[in-house]
């Protein structure tokens, strides 16, 4: 490919106008496939089509919002052979894998088994490195091995259930139980009562509460503090680009109460993440992680999500994710002013340490509209009314289905993202736009950013 010999041109558009899926404005020449269907993938797609280097965009399977940016395509995104056939048939230059499941399933590895795809840019780690998210125990061992600050822990199976229950007795409440494998973001339990924690451990290990994901359970000490996330794009050779931080809001209810969700909103930047905390986070967590991947020979070209908590003893890692977060992507990626394709090409070439990242200094805030009943049972197929262009607000679709009338197709339906001089201004714009949109049962939190 002549892909990497080109002069790369940046064009930063604060209010891009997109017509169909032909998005190259100057020297259009690259075809991009984004894998996934959520708000994260819509936000990534929105940023990609702002690049002067994007000729055609495909999204698999996409949603009602991505259909306006590119061509939605029906693919089994965990089937590497099917994805590879599409890549070859449509001369794809860059594949951006949004969700974790295809990465843990080894889709990146599968694509690279085809000699003609040797130069394909794939954003997302190989299967071995994806275990950082695929296995909590694997991630904890990695952190311990590389002296990365995290909570003390032990891992148990159904054969060591009694030892696990005894270990719980040595801890102070609340008790943190984590299913080892992928559990759609629902595999972490924080329990105040010791007897209830013991019973839940049995439910997870013996009764397979989370299926195979809880065949092993990590029990760890509870860390008190305020959570936040930071993101990096790494090139697999020790180079990385640090992206903006964010704080998301997981609980369904006001004041962070009720059941966990995939995320009800997010804010970036995070006011308490000052220069001193940033320096310590980079020194104690980011760089040891990036270097640890190289030392352990874990092939990793892609986004690293650092789920962190700021404690009285400094920042500690709660979890790694091997892709961007959702809804964090909807506030982090819009702030990015560097051409995102430049970043992906530098990642592929191993030259990220030579590239500076420009970030919009304004605050971005997003609020998620969800289906009635979510995160429990909810109905789909509800017509969405009032969608249009909102001044200062971008609507990123998640659980929507394209058609003559766009309808709901998931629990989290749309993210309303706005910029402002501060979080209050940004949130005011998002909430104003939210009030113009409706569907039967629509719900959202009114207090995003309340603790910042």
Language-model features: locations:
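Active-site "cap" helix and flanking loop/linker of ATP-utilizing ligase/carboxylase catalytic domains
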Residues: 282-304, 321-390, 401
